Amino acid sequence: MTIDHAAFVRANTSILSPPLVPEIKLHLAHEALPIWQKTEDELGEIGLPPPFWAFAWAGGQALSRYVLDTPTTVLGKRVVELASGSGMVGIAAMMAGAKSVLSADIDLFSIAAIEVNAKQNSVSLSITSEDLLTQPVPEVDLILVGDLFYEKGVAMRCLAWLEQAQAKGIDVLIGDPGRSYLPKDRLLKVAEYSVPVSRDLEDAEIKSTAVWRLA
């Protein structure tokens, strides 16, 4: 069965602006459970991870806000957005003047969401479904990471790859509300925001969320 991922994204979301970044419009779900179930039905699988692409997570919102408020962070730079989800952070980077953005996510629904969201915001991104953590670090100036330290294995792989990037002189910025495996001892806080989020996804309606630099 061939799945039209873009059609699924459009059919199961509404065009909304994340609370912290009203400049950006994304195809987002109103509730977590219905779209989660529909994703499982569409793929004929159960036990799938949440459709991360369908929500504006706290870390991504904070990182997007920081990029938009401090455009010199990305101005004229080659940027990678790791584990892009909706593509929100990459879109923010292009809006703030990045030379280029490569948005990466292994979920094909995410790839479709990034495409439709980029068009919605009139920006052009490069997109890949390759797992960049298994690849050599690309020749870029900046890597942006939102909300990727929620699971130990992923967090360890991510940090090792980001440390390789840092060793090459690449700047690394991370948006995170204090997930369990965030390596705070390796990070320098550069900004902090109170981010409105969904109780479907989080344990509070407002998450204190920081932007960190790998130090």
For every predicted segment, state its role.
Residues M1-A215:
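S-adenosylmethionine-dependent methyltransferases
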